[in-house]
Amino acid sequence: MAKHLFTSESVSEGHPDKIADQISDAVLDAILEQDPKARVACETYVKTGMVMVGGEVTTSAWVDIEEITRNTVREIGYTHSDMGFDADSCAILNVIGKQSPDINQGVDRADPKEQGAGDQGLMFGYANNETDVFMPAPITYSHMLVKRQSEVRKDKTLPWLRPDAKSQVTFAYNSDGSIAGIDAVVLSTQHSEDVTQADLIEGVMESIIKPVLPAKWLSKETKYFINPTGRFVIGGPVGDCGLTGRKIIVDTYGGMARHGGGAFSGKDPSKVDRSAAYAARYVAKNIVAAGLADRCELQVSYAIGVAEPTSISIETFGTAKVAEELLIDLVRRHFDLRPYGLTEMLNLARPIYKSTAAYGHFGREEFPWEATDKVEALRADAGL
């Protein structure tokens, strides 16, 4: 069968952009813990020796931004000046202001069910059946590689590893869409000065790549690129500045689905960039899990200050078992996609976001938008 290739990448929790995402979501969680109705838009910038936390917040809560920031950086593993970034000595600037009352006017309502969207925008949710978590394989295994890198770094299996790392996996697909195998694997990891290139390659292959990637998809044709530049000592915020919201494809579907452009981290659930993207994933996953399609991409859009979505559309890439018009009707009947409705449906007004900020927001069963609790109702209503 003819084959085509598809590639996705991921980055570790120590990547500068992911440091920023985790700080933003740690601040959000701390505020939501005290004030579930808070309005939060928290942005973070990190560079050598400095973290700047800014944005707009309206809340009755008080949180210690400096302590939250230092704790987050420490948990990631930047704890010594030898790494170029130290949780205990970096400067922290707090430039958070209040949310515009013009936005509040459009969002808040006497009847919370009529809460308007916090902004206009379009969001996508996607699912397919090529993995047991209904996610594309390239992004799933890219995440697993850098997650494994973090584990063997923290448990000292490979004590010379440092926090910054990137992965990339290229899958080969048959013409019918089934997986033929893995064509290429890239893993670049920051390391200490004292490890040789040979030991690094062996350690990464034996302790990271082989335990993660299924042997059935590997062959003698599979290509491996482990630290292909030969040296990756300078990394983290010293190597590159980091910014919240700059890894939106890593956070979602690795490029296999479209993206509306809005980032997630640092945003409370009134921001449909985040909450509606989670709800769209919930819808798409339940449609695929119910057997109504093998692949499903749902688009939803909003106008600022308006509760009802301005559009809902579905693309199943020719894999639907029922008419797409029926799928849209099922979505409208079984899922409340108004901002208040989806926040209630998925119980989003609580501190659950920091753990989303590294290794992907989707395909992880601990999150409420990954539940498949609508499967039976969808099948029954579709007549299956």
From Swiss-Prot:
GO terms for cellular component: cytoplasm. It catalyses: L-methionine + ATP + H2O = S-adenosyl-L-methionine + phosphate + diphosphate. GO terms for molecular function: ATP binding; magnesium ion binding; methionine adenosyltransferase activity. Gene3D superfamilies: 3.30.300.10. Its cofactor is Mg(2+); K(+). Its main location: cytoplasm. It comes from the Bacteria. Its EC number is 2.5.1.6. It is an enzyme of class 2 (transferase). SUPFAM superfamilies: S-adenosylmethionine synthetase (SSF55973). K(+) binds at residue 43. Residues 99-109 are annotated as: Flexible loop. Pathway: Amino-acid biosynthesis; S-adenosyl-L-methionine biosynthesis; S-adenosyl-L-methionine from L-methionine: step 1/1. Keywords: ATP-binding, Cytoplasm, Magnesium, Metal-binding, Nucleotide-binding, One-carbon metabolism, Potassium, Transferase. L-methionine binds at residues 56, 99, 240, 271. Mg(2+) binds at residue 17. Belongs to the AdoMet synthase family. Homotetramer; dimer of dimers. NCBIfam families: metK. This is S-adenosylmethionine synthase. It comes from Shewanella woodyi (strain ATCC 51908 / MS32).
